[in-house]
């Protein structure tokens, strides 16, 4: 478990902050009430970050901030007196942020800031600028915000990275660059990635007011004019990443089955139509199967819908853990699921589904009264898909029907 160090001489406040961080974010939190205690902790451990009171009894002039930065730890400064002079002095240092410690809202802000930094570790940012000095400056600021950073010198290199690295969240690009400038890059990126997929922020010293509108109309999410403060930079980056996460959350809810967390029927067809056409055109071997729980109505009638839901979730877990990352499994509704195994031979597909059938057959669902129940599935496997996706699903359904008619707990294939 990652650790956070809180350094604050007000013991009540320090304990309150530590407790909220532990309960809400899951970090192990250690508390020091003086500069001396903090030094002892820092000698023994490294921390995800430190929350540091600027004015301690044995370090009244903020000496602790420089000491912790020199030790290689990240710092968020706590202060009860934030004014323009304070801001200017703090922003000269390589701190993450500063926070007022006046009340409950300030503590909530601390929690939100740490939560944001924790999430930032999951994101990659691509910095595109022909100035090595500026690239390194951007990289340093972004890494201090816990982002993973890739840097390149121009637009063509950026497109190459985007083609080979699939999980980039944000592109931070300069305008004027050799080979391919930022505007051309933005236009090219938007041919492949929507604003729901990837955020683009332009940074430029161009003083023409039309430039901002030009970039925004070409698909940029935001535009930062040089020179800018570190504070403005971090706020804009964090806000853009948070907006992207919110879009992902909304989209994910729309695409997921509420009970199992698997994809739903809507997502399956939206995703499968383009894949199906390309796979047929490329002669890619793939398999479509429809899976149904045997005697599910009897399970519901005998044990109730809560147990029925538990059985559905048990099957969902088995399906989820027995497919590869590229395959698709979706709950079509009720007790019926559909699976597409990609880049697989018929022999391999049948072996995989037999393994799934056996795992389900051997699964035991324990009830609260210590009773145990078992269930089975029937599977219709289409090894050689039809001309269209709809025809293929219908054919797999017919094979499933045959499996039911021929005794259940079995696989039928074409």
Residue ranges and their predicted role:
Residues 271-303, 319, 330, 349:
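Active-site-proximal structural segments of metal-dependent nucleotidyl cyclase/transferase enzymes
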Residues 350, 382-413:
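Catalytic-core segments of nucleotide cyclases and related cyclic-nucleotide turnover enzymes
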Residues 307-328, 336:
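Active-site-proximal alpha-helical element of nucleotidyl cyclase-like catalytic domains
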Residues 251-270, 291-305, 313:
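Conserved nucleotide-binding and Mg2+-coordinating catalytic segments in signaling enzymes
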Residues 251-252, 265-285, 316-324, 342:
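Short regulatory alpha-helical coupling segments
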Residues 296, 315, 329-332, 337, ...:
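Hydrophobic framework residues that shape the active-site pocket
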């Amino acid at each position: 478990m990652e650790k956070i160090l809180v350094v604050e001489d007000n013991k009540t406040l320090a304990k309150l902050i530590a407790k909220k961080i532990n309960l809400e974010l899951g970090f192990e939190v250690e508390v020091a009430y003086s500069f001396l205690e903090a030094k002892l902790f820092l000698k023994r451990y490294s921390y995800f970050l430190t929350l540091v009171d600027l004015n301690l009894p044995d370090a009244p002039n903020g000496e602790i901030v420089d000491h912790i930065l020199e030790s290689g730890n990240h710092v968020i400064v706590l202060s009860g007196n934030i004014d323009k002079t304070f801001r200017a002095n703090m922003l000269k240092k390589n701190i993450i942020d500063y926070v007022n410690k006046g009340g409950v809202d300030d503590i909530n802000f601390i929690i939100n800031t740490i939560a944001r930094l924790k999430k930032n570790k999951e994101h990659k940012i691509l910095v595109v600028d022909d100035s090595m000095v500026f690239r390194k400056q951007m990289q340093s600021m972004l890494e201090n915000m816990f982002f993973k950073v890739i840097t390149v010198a121009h637009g063509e290199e950026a497109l190459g990275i985007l083609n080979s690295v699939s999980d980039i969240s944000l592109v931070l690009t300069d305008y004027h660059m050799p080979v391919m400038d930022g505007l051309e890059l933005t236009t090219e990126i938007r041919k492949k990635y929507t604003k729901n997929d990837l955020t683009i922020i332009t940074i430029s010293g161009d003083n023409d007011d039309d430039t901002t509108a030009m970039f925004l109309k070409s698909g940029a999410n935001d535009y930062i004019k040089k020179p800018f403060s570190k504070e403005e930079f971090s706020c804009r980056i964090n806000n853009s990443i948070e907006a992207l996460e919110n879009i992902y959350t909304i989209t994910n809810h729309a695409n997921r089955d509420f009970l199992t967390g698997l994809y739903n029927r809507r997502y399956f067809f939206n995703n499968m139509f383009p894949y199906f056409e390309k796979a047929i055109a490329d002669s890619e071997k793939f398999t479509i199967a429809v899976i149904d729980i045997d005697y599910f109505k009897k399970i519901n009638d005998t044990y109730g819908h809560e147990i029925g839901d538990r059985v559905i979730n048990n099957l969902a877990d088995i399906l989820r853990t027995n497919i590869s990352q590229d395959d698709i499994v979706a709950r079509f509704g009720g007790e019926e699921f559909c699976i597409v195994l990609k880049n697989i031979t018929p022999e391999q597909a049948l072996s995989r589904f037999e393994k799934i059938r056996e795992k389900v057959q051997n699964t035991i669902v324990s009830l609260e009264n210590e009773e145990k129940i078992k269930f089975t599935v029937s599977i219709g496997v289409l090894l050689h898909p039809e001309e269209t996706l709809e025809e293929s699903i219908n054919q797999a359904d017919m094979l499933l029907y045959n499996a039911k008619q021929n005794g259940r707990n079995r696989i039928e294939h074409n």
